């Protein structure tokens, strides 16, 4: 597979799940006429790679090829602070102009689908893997080999067809405003079923499944825990307590500290970020009856204008 310098973006901010760039050796082909020809071609490619490395390194060649293309454009579905830092760091490291547009995972999927093989961006960076899997099924992502994929914790942190690789992991749970709960004389919810109690009516926020991959994961989690029919009944009951469905998955977490939201459902790392911003009135809760986690991914969009 062709090596892609665009993947270096993931390298700059990978959190131990994977890094990117490079390719793995292919398995030995069977001895047929076609296989012999393929082996010869592979040998020639290997020689070309060796020449490149001898001339200053394979990565150096990729960097120069990418610089010649002028810029890198990113659709980002992680938090904007993280996305901005990744792009700035990439630009600083490699001297390649990098620009981004922050969109939810569902928005990126819709946009790339509409662009039909001629995407406005080159890389999709961050956001839960479910929409990435949909994009794989629709043929919207470019397969690539990541040389550092051998460092993955497990195979569940990458696409089986190598169309995306994980760059972080997030645990699903609740974030509550302890001051507001105390003012209302309420205990914090401990389980998913607790969220349907009448005492929490109008106090809960979660993201919209039409726009946020986070909400889709919440739905999938309940289906796995309860079965489809019981899960649908659960969401009917939960809906009675929902004050607002936000556009983005991190939206509810941002409203907990200021008191606009008493109980938020989402990824706990979003709550940690708010605590680091000074909101020490936020408590993080891992549901006692079980939960799930996301794998935040990165991928190259098929038909990217800057493939190197």
Role assignments for model-derived ranges:
Residues 73-87, 99-115, 119-260:
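Extracytoplasmic ligand-binding site segments that recognize negatively charged/polar headgroups
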Residues 170, 234-239, 245-246, 278-304:
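Periplasmic-binding protein-like
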Residues 65-67, 166, 214, 290-293:
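Short, flexible turn/loop "capping" segments at secondary-structure junctions
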Residues 1-69:
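Short, low-complexity disordered leader/linker segments with a strong preference
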Residues 130-134, 262-281:
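A ligand-binding cleft/hinge motif common to bilobed small-molecule-binding domains
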Residues 252-253, 269-273, 289-292:
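Short, catalytically relevant binding-site loops at active-site mouths
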Residues 190-199, 296-308:
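Bilobed periplasmic-binding protein/Venus flytrap-like ligand-binding cleft at the lobe interface
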Residues 37, 56-67, 71-97, 174, ...:
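Short, polar/charged alpha-helical segment
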């Amino acid at each position: 597979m062709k090596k892609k310098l665009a993947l270096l973006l993931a390298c700059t901010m990978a959190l131990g799940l994977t890094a990117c760039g490079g390719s793995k050796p292919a398995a030995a082909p069977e001895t047929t006429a076609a296989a012999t020809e393929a082996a010869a071609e592979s040998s020639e490619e290997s020689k070309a790679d060796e020449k490149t490395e001898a001339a200053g390194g394979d990565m150096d060649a990729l960097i120069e090829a990418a610089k010649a293309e002028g810029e890198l454009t990113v659709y980002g579905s992680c938090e904007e602070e993280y996305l901005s830092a990744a792009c700035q760091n990439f630009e600083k490291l490699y001297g390649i102009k990098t620009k981004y547009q922050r969109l939810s995972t569902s928005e990126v999927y819709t946009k790339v689908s509409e662009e039909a093989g001629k995407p406005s961006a080159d890389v999709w960076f961050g956001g839960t893997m479910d929409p990435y899997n949909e994009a794989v099924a629709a043929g919207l992502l470019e397969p690539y080999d990541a040389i550092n994929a051998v460092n993955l914790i497990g195979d569940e942190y990458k696409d089986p067809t190598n169309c995306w690789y994980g760059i972080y992991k997030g645990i699903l749970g609740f974030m509550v405003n302890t001051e507001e709960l105390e003012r209302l004389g309420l205990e914090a919810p401990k389980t998913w079923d607790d969220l349907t109690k009448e005492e929490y009516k109008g106090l809960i926020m979660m993201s919209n499944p039409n726009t946020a991959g986070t909400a889709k994961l919440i739905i999938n989690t309940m289906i796995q825990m309860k079965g489809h029919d019981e899960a649908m009944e659960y969401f009917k009951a939960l809906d009675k307590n929902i004050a607002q469905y936000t556009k983005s998955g991190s939206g509810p977490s941002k409203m907990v500290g200021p008191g606009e939201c008493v109980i938020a459902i989402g990824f706990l790392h979003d709550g940690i970020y708010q605590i680091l911003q000074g909101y020490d009135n936020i408590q993080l809760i891992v549901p006692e009856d079980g939960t799930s986690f996301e794998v935040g991914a990165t991928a190259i969009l098929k038909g990217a204008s800057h493939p190197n």
